[in-house]
Amino acid sequence: MDDLDALLADLESTTSHISKRPVFLSEETPYSYPTGNHTYQEIAVPPPVPPPPSSEALNGTILDPLDQWQPSSSRFIHQQPQSSSPVYGSSAKTSSVSNPQDSVGSPCSRVGEEEHVYSFPNKQKSAEPSPTVMSTSLGSNLSELDRLLLELNAVQHNPPGFPADEANSSPPLPGALSPLYGVPETNSPLGGKAGPLTKEKPKRNGGRGLEDVRPSVESLLDELESSVPSPVPAITVNQGEMSSPQRVTSTQQQTRISASSATRELDELMASLSDFKIQGLEQRADGERCWAAGWPRDGGRSSPGGQDEGGFMAQGKTGSSSPPGGPPKPGSQLDSMLGSLQSDLNKLGVATVAKGVCGACKKPIAGQVVTAMGKTWHPEHFVCTHCQEEIGSRNFFERDGQPYCEKDYHNLFSPRCYYCNGPILDKVVTALDRTWHPEHFFCAQCGAFFGPEGFHEKDGKAYCRKDYFDMFAPKCGGCARAILENYISALNTLWHPECFVCRECFTPFVNGSFFEHDGQPYCEVHYHERRGSLCSGCQKPITGRCITAMAKKFHPEHFVCAFCLKQLNKGTFKEQNDKPYCQNCFLKLFC
């Protein structure tokens, strides 16, 4: 356990220098060989029954084929001349001298063209701890190991860069090389005490490493895997495969993943998950998804590399090998999202019954629906025919089976006011074969609105009663006002009955008789007065003979002397102070 604590401390101190490739040591270090004493002894006669695989083999702790054991001083190759079967070697934990019955092997069939030697190193323990102390120590070390692996994963996203030639190069693979056992030089030729075996690691680029003293990450992980048993076997072996130790060991050796390949697969998995989050919506055009659940698709058995037998990666990506295309168009992306949503709801058992077919796009309606004009519409497709604006919850008008918004409908189809030429939205007045706003239908002369008495029309214009009669009704010859009701027609004009009187005395004409002078009606007296046919003596009109004297007219019997009152019929008279006198009276009075 002290060695395990030291390995954990060294692993924690070297995590900041880890690259994606494991660091191979250029020379031997104290960490390159186990601390326990190992013995080696050639097997002369193979036993009939091979031993069962150890707990490390069942837990998946199989040494890398690259690992080779060599002694600290020299290396010898031992091959059995007559048998090419691999040798299973086991070493004791406490004894320092090997026992021929402690290490056994079995002949097996030849695998490939090379010989394999499988070794299970065991560590020497100074003292056997109690089970309680052992479990507590293992639990704490496992927790520390989990924390260090998390730090290792974090370092993998920001690794220190190697030079181009080292980053692109990979460690040399074993190829067709045979596994080698290194036997140290001892005093005894055979069966003596063997020195500590050292584990030789291949070197990167001719033996160059990041550090010559620090152990590599792969060697540390190998030591940890061999020291701490895993509670759950990583590899499942069928019962039919347990009959042959060589088959079990070969399967375990093929499925073992090194630390560098595991971290590389972890990086690929994280990158695939990131791509799935970004391009998840773009790759669901057919409505199918591959969920990143961690189990293989189609019921296939998952392989250690993270790829199932069906050939799909359980990383959230589809099985298509074609690269993802460019971003789809907004319309196709919307249709793809709607189709994926509907398929997902159907998979979950949620029934998505279409509410109808849109009258515009002829597609089924699954969300909000607008019902109008006996049809169903998508809300975004129920628009005005003229301006193409969404009508929504506003009022609309129908014309020839097409919807129109209120503004466009009135501008296109509403009646126009004759006065302002604007559309009539509410009440309308129809007059004179035209349409009007109620507030624009008024008297053309005074601008007053028409009352209950109505209006009068003249030359296509509307007038109130007063203005119409004032402007167009016949005028009275006496008062010059419009004649609205009864009238008298005389002297080529119309008269109010109360206005047809003598223009001098304003006396109504009795029996309808009147005298006209200069276009005006007069009574008889004023008529003769105006004409001068009134007797100057009696002040009555002269209808018969008359005498004209002193610029006056007289009845013959009324032309008399102003003093004696005798009729002046002879035609001679004297005038004095505008009065007529006979000859005798004139002589008497003025002579």
UniProtKB/Swiss-Prot annotation:
Keywords: Acetylation, Cell adhesion, Cell junction, Cytoplasm, Cytoskeleton, LIM domain, Metal-binding, Phosphoprotein, Repeat, Zinc
GO function term, MF aspect, one: neuropilin binding
Cellular localization per UniProt: Cytoplasm, Cytoskeleton; Cell junction, Focal adhesion; Cytoplasm, Cell cortex
Renumbered ranges of motif LD motif 1: 3-15
Residues found modified as Phosphothreonine: 132
Region (Disordered): 17-138, 159-260, 291-335
Name of one Pfam family that matches: LIM
PROSITE patterns xrefs: LIM_DOMAIN_1, LIM_DOMAIN_2
Polar residues compositional bias, start-end: 69-106, 121-137, 236-260
Listed Pro residues bias regions: 45-54
Residue positions, PTM Phosphotyrosine: 31, 88, 118, 181
One GO CC term on file: cell cortex
Motif (LD motif 4): 265-276
Subunit annotation: Interacts in vitro with VCL/vinculin as well as to the SH3 domain of SRC and, when tyrosine phosphorylated, to the SH2 domain of CRK. Interacts with GIT1. Interacts with NUDT16L1/SDOS. Interacts with PTK2/FAK1. Interacts with PTK2B/PYK2. Interacts with ASAP2. Interacts with unphosphorylated ITGA4. Interacts with RNF5. Interacts with PDCD10. Interacts with NEK3, the interaction is prolactin-dependent. Interacts with PTK6. Interacts with TGFB1I1. Interacts with SORBS1. Interacts with PARVB. Interacts (via LD motif 4) with PARVA/PARVIN. Interacts (via LD motif 4) with ILK.
Protein function: Cytoskeletal protein involved in actin-membrane attachment at sites of cell adhesion to the extracellular matrix (focal adhesion). Recruits other proteins such as TRIM15 to focal adhesion.
Protein name per UniProt: Paxillin
Natural source organism: Homo sapiens
